[in-house]
């Protein structure tokens, strides 16, 4: 996850989308080594199979898959992604939610948006837009809740070693940091 400023979200999300190809190409584990077949990259395929709720009948083939790279660039804000996901996909899981986000805002507090976050976790975009709230301890002893936005690169493969995983993540974070400062538009 990379935390980004709300004003920079669309640009940084698009940058992460543009970096998927080169980062995945450098991070992908080969299923072949010295003529032997090893384990292959299965992260995306696993999620495709696990959360694809489409029927196999021909009348449903035009429905969007819950696992996808995405359809278009993000133009202005994270809201575009959330609106699209809410409009296209039914909820897969539910929970008891006791938060009324409007009431929370009216009280001057930060809403958790648990229903949105739960739904967002069931739509598997290769780069996920994330909203969260964290507790902040201030030097004067007070505490506050601070909302934040993150971009999560979900296509990085697992293993084969922890060092490989850290290196792959460092590559993505380094590219995001460097090009995020240099490029105004992807």
Describe the residue ranges of each PLM region.
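C-terminal accessory/tail domains of diverse enzymes
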Residues: 1, 5-186
């Amino acid at each position: 996850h990379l935390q980004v400023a709300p004003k920079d979200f669309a640009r940084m999300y698009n940058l992460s989308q543009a970096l998927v190809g080169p980062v995945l190409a450098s991070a992908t584990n080969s299923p072949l080594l010295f003529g032997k077949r090893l384990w292959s990259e299965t992260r995306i395929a696993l999620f495709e199979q696990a959360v694809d709720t489409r029927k196999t009948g021909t009348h449903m083939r035009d429905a969007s898959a819950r696992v996808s790279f995405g359809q278009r660039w993000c133009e202005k804000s994270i809201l575009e992604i959330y609106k699209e996901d809410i409009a296209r996909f039914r909820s897969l899981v539910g929970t008891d939610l006791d938060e009324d986000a409007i009431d929370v805002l009216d009280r001057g507090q930060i809403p958790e948006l648990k229903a949105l976050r739960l739904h967002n976790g069931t739509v598997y975009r290769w780069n996920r837009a994330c909203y969260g709230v964290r507790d902040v301890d201030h030097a004067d002893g007070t505490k506050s809740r601070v909302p934040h936005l993150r971009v999560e690169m979900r296509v990085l493969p697992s293993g084969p070693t922890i060092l490989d995983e850290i290196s792959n993540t460092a590559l993505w974070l380094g590219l995001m940091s460097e090009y995020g400062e240099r490029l105004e538009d992807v």
